[in-house]
């Protein structure tokens, strides 16, 4: 699980973004994304991929996209 956040007090911005890869019951891989304001419930989206390699590539793309938008990695979950 990868945790990202973006905090900008001047713009009253406190956002989080979580990315996670999980296997499905049907042998596919799911990229789970959750985002929202820190301290509030967020929104979720799940994208399913036929192979782990494709899911990892999508995760890397999303991570680059978030880092370009000034999100900072705050830690990896267990």
What are these regions (language model features)?
Residues 12-18:
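Charged, amphipathic alpha-helical segments
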Residues 1-12:
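Negatively charged, low-complexity tracts enriched in Asp/Glu with abundant Ser/Thr
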Residues 65-78:
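Short, mixed-charge low-complexity intrinsically disordered segments
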Residues 8, 30, 42, 53, ...:
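Solvent-exposed, flexible loop/coil residues
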Residues 18-45, 60-61:
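Short aromatic-glycine-(Arg/Gly/Cys) micro-motifs in beta-strand/loop hairpins
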Residues 1, 49, 54, 77-78:
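Disulfide-stabilized extracellular ectodomains of secreted/luminal proteins, especially beta-rich
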Residues 41, 49-68:
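A short, charged, amphipathic alpha-helix used as a generic interaction element across diverse proteins
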């Amino acid at each position: 699980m990868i945790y990202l956040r973006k905090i900008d007090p001047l713009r009253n911005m406190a956002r989080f973004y979580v990315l996670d890869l999980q296997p499905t019951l049907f042998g596919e891989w799911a990229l789970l994304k959750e985002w929202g304001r820190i301290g509030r419930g967020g929104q979720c989206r799940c994208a399913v991929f036929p192979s782990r390699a494709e899911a990892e590539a999508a995760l890397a793309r999303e991570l680059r996209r978030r880092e370009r938008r000034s999100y900072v990695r705050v830690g990896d979950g267990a």
